[in-house]
Structure formats: structure tokens, C-alpha cells
UniProtKB/Swiss-Prot annotation:
It is an enzyme of class 4 (lyase). The gene is pyrF. Its EC number is 4.1.1.23. This is Orotidine 5'-phosphate decarboxylase. It catalyses: orotidine 5'-phosphate + H(+) = UMP + CO2. Keywords: Decarboxylase, Lyase, Pyrimidine biosynthesis. InterPro entries: Aldolase_TIM, OMPdecase_type-2, OMPdeCOase_dom, RibuloseP-bd_barrel. One of its GO terms (molecular function) is orotidine-5'-phosphate decarboxylase activity. Belongs to the OMP decarboxylase family. Type 2 subfamily. Pathway: Pyrimidine metabolism; UMP biosynthesis via de novo pathway; UMP from orotate: step 2/2.
Length: 274
């Protein structure tokens, strides 16, 4: 999926919502535990209930890998289900990979060749040769960690060099030498607020994947005020605030209502550019 197709989906659905599939076997409704594959059964119900309200899904690999082979099978089935039934959805593998070149090449092969996923989150700490293997696949995206929403982001990402440049700013500037805004996005946490204004001075045209709205306390209005550009430029993720709002047999209906509430807010924000 290219940048224009992504923007067309945003305009059509009046939404830039990404539903995070952070599926924890300990948190799904109890009645699903009797299913042959409880994780996939949960994901399928959430996807069917929200697909017309969002433009992306983001399975977090840690939740699947923690269950071993069963978890990976559920992940593969989830990706396949989205691709076959909702082909307009942008799929993000939230894997946060990034290693020496030949290792990154294997990670890239997993997500882009074997699973044919649209994008993968990548950690930039090891530099260019850890990222470029992901960029050899035409039509696929790298979503580079830039400024995250966790408290620990202050430990490294906000530290300044002798010239006053913060580490996340250096990541943004340097990585533009590796790919343009048709191949690369950045993770910027919703809790970072006014930092979006500084980020847009460096990467005015790139899409930003924004976690942290909802359960983590980020403000959608503030993110849009400082982060939205002429093609929206935002994919805002919500996980717990949608998928875990109800643990009864009506969990999917409740998830839909939660997603709908966010979509309505997004439609209002999009009026500024549409």
C-alpha cells in the first residue's frame, strides 16, 4: 500500500484509527477459552466489529510470541484473515526489530515475504545497516522508533548533544538519508504533546504512527493540532481502550462502540484538511 492509497482510505472512512491487537490470553472473555484457537477467535471478532471504522491493525508480536508456536499460528491466521477479508487495511507488525544486517534481512523476509505484511516497526539504535534490509522490499514500509510514549523515553531519546540536538531529532534527520516519506514512517507517542510541533519541522510530510491515545493518557486533539499535515500524516493507535472495554459475550459490540467514539472524533479533526 502506498502513501496515496493510505490517504484515500483515511478520506473514505473519515478515520485514521489503528486498532492494536495486543491480545492477552489472560484478558480475553472467558467464554472464548473453549475455542480451538481462543486468540484468533478474539481477534476475528474484534476485526469484524471494527473494520469499517479503522484503517489499520497492529498486532504486537510480544503477545503472540509469548505463547510459543500456538501464538505464532494465531498471529499468522490473524494476518491472513485481514488480508483475505479486509484487503484495504494497512497491517503493521509491531515487532520493534533491528539487528546486524544479515539478521535484519531475515526479519524482513519473515514479515514481507512470508507474511506479506505492509509494515514493521524497527528500532534504529544499531544504525543504517540494521534498517536498510527492510527497505529493499518495494511497497513495504519501515516504521522507525523516534520518540516513544513510555517514561523511559527520557533516558536516551530526549538527551541532547553538545549542539543541543536531541537524540530523537538526530534519528529523524539521519534516517531521511535512507528512505523518503513513501517508504518510512516514525513512531511518536501521543503523550509527547508539543514535541509534535518540533517533529513536523524535521519531517513535515511523513506519516507518524502514534500510540498512547486512550489508556496511556495521550490527547487526540493535541496530537492533531501539532501533528496533522495536509495528507493527515497520522495513524493513531488504540489497543486496550478498544479491545478490552468489555469481557462479556458482547465484547465485540462494546469494542465497536469504543472504536466508533474515536472515529467520530477523528472525523471532526479531519474537517481541517478535507
Amino acid at each position: 500500500m502506498n502513501k496515496q492509497q493510505l490517504f484515500e482510505n483515511i478520506k473514505r472512512k473519515k478515520s485514521f484509527l489503528c486498532v492494536g491487537l495486543d491480545t492477552d490470553i489472560k484478558k480475553i472473555p472467558e467464554h472464548l477459552l473453549k475455542e480451538e484457537d481462543p486468540i484468533f477467535a478474539f481477534n476475528k471478532a474484534i476485526i469484524d466489529a471494527t473494520a469499517d471504522l479503522c484503517i489499520a491493525y497492529k498486532p504486537n508480536l510480544a503477545f503472540y510470541e509469548s505463547m510459543g508456536v500456538k501464538g505464532w499460528i494465531a498471529f499468522e491466521k490473524t494476518v491472513k484473515y485481514i488480508k483475505e477479508n479486509y484487503p484495504d487495511q494497512f497491517i503493521i507488525a509491531d515487532a520493534k526489530r533491528g539487528d546486524i544486517g544479515n539478521t535484519s534481512a531475515m526479519y524482513a523476509r519473515t514479515f514481507f515475504e512470508e507474511l506479506e505484511i505492509d509494515s514493521v516497526t524497527v528500532a534504529p539504535y544499531m544504525g543504517e545497516d540494521s534498517v536498510t534490509p527492510f527497505l529493499t522490499y518495494e511497497g513495504k514500509w519501515v516504521i522507525l522508533l523516534a520518540l516513544t510514549s513510555n517514561k523511559g523515553s527520557h533516558d536516551f531519546q530526549l538527551t541532547e548533544d553538545a549542539n543541543g540536538e536531541r537524540l530523537f531529532e538526530k534519528v529523524l534527520r539521519k534516517s531521511q538519508e535512507w528512505a523518503n516519506d513513501e517508504r518510512m514512517m516514525y513512531v511518536v507517542g501521543a503523550t509527547q504533546g508539543r514535541a509534535f510541533e518540533d517533529i513536523r519541522k524535521i519531517v513535515p510530510n511523513h506519516f507518524l504512527l502514534v500510540p498512547g491515545v486512550g489508556a496511556q493518557g495521550g490527547s487526540l486533539e493535541e496530537v492533531c493540532k501539532y501533528g496533522m499535515n495536509s495528507t493527515c500524516g497520522l495513524i493513531v493507535n488504540s489497543s486496550r481502550g478498544i479491545i478490552y472495554v468489555d469481557k462479556t459475550e458482547k465484547f465485540a459490540e462494546a469494542a465497536r462502540l469504543a472504536a466508533q467514539e474515536v472515529q467520530v472524533q477523528m472525523a471532526e479533526q479531519l474537517k481541517a484538511i478535507l
